Amino acid sequence: MAAVLEVEIGGEAVREAAGEEVDLSELAPEERWRVEHARMHAKHRGHEAMHAEMVLILIATLVVAQLLLVQWKQRHQRSYNMVTLFQMWIVPVYFTVKLHWWRFLGIWFLFSIVTAFVTYKATRKPLVQTTPRLVYKWFLLLYKMSYATGIVGYIAVMFTLFGLNLLFRIKPEDAMDFGISLLFYGLYYGVLGRDFAEMCADYMASTIGFYSASGMPTKHLSDSVCAVCGQQIFVDVNEEGIIENTYRLSCNHVFHEFCIRGWCIVGKKQTCPYCKEKVDLKRMFSNPWERPHVMYGQLLDWLRYLVAWQPVIIGLVQGINYCLGLE
């Protein structure tokens, strides 16, 4: 029995018999998509029970994977963070090479070179005095760039949804591609930069000696020394600095502005680097224009699971479906 596939193209009905293939290369992109979409529906017609099984497998795998990841993070947080960071760094590269997204690959390569150099400097012993400020300035710059890129991408997406792109005679698909690309760049490099900054912060702070992940610090902190970078503080808390200001936490310990911003916002540390007292970020950054940076950092934490682990879980689900003969 010959199956007949009907696709509406340009107002005319195009019939594709079972032995008669339509040359997709001669069709416009939208028409080609319609033909492929109709073929997919014809292929999966009558597979409702099989599709229901696949949905149940997907839901069960997501629930089990989430429980396992939570337990792993609670019991062995260090290994969990390292594996997550590695996947965040490697997994998107596989898709970019497969889809020939050379622009993303070039930016990723440049980011990897600079970040590898900064990470190498941060993990050396003895630690050079200028290294902590170099590290925090780089990751703080990267964080602000990713934040700005994400905001521009979000605005571009919203403008497209409201049709404002037509005022500039920009096609909706071009405007949406531009916005989503910028949004992805901002979120991806924001997450990746924060994870590298957290790792470097632990190495540097423990090397300097004023901070220890577990136990007492190996050095005593004087009133005029920053516990993050170990260098002298010359600007008083009440004075306006030329390059940067000095911040005092609720525990009365003082730090350089770049250092404590890098430690708390970029490095994801919510405690004092010396005494481990809880830091109130809303109190420390009282300016309302600075608070979105804190909320943006929390958003990046939520999205880490989607970028690092979601492709792995989807791949596992596809493997299960393949073994069970589901399509």
Swiss-Prot record:
Family: Belongs to the RNF121 family.
An MF annotation (GO) of this entry: zinc ion binding
Membrane-spanning residues: 50-70, 79-96, 99-119, 148-168, 173-193
Main location class: endoplasmic reticulum
Native species: Xenopus tropicalis
InterPro entries: RNF121/RNF175 (IPR040176), Znf_RING (IPR001841), Znf_RING/FYVE/PHD (IPR013083)
GO CC list: endoplasmic reticulum membrane
Enzyme class: transferase
UniProt KW Ion transport keyword: no
UniProt name for this protein: E3 ubiquitin ligase Rnf121
GO process terms (BP): protein ubiquitination
Enzyme nomenclature, EC number: 2.3.2.27
Record field: catalytic activity: S-ubiquitinyl-[E2 ubiquitin-conjugating enzyme]-L-cysteine + [acceptor protein]-L-lysine = [E2 ubiquitin-conjugating enzyme]-L-cysteine + N(6)-ubiquitinyl-[acceptor protein]-L-lysine
Subcellular location: Endoplasmic reticulum membrane
Membrane-topology descriptor: Multi-pass membrane protein
ZnF segments: RING-type: 226-276
Pathway it works in: Protein modification; protein ubiquitination
Top-level taxon in the UniProt lineage: Eukaryota
Keywords, alphabetical: Endoplasmic reticulum, Membrane, Metal-binding, Transferase, Transmembrane, Transmembrane helix, Zinc, Zinc-finger
Function of the molecule: E3 ubiquitin ligase which accepts ubiquitin and transfers it to substrates thereby promoting their degradation by the endoplasmic reticulum-associated degradation (ERAD) pathway which is a pathway involved in ubiquitin-dependent degradation of misfolded endoplasmic reticulum proteins. May regulate the unfolded protein response to reduce endoplasmic reticulum stress.
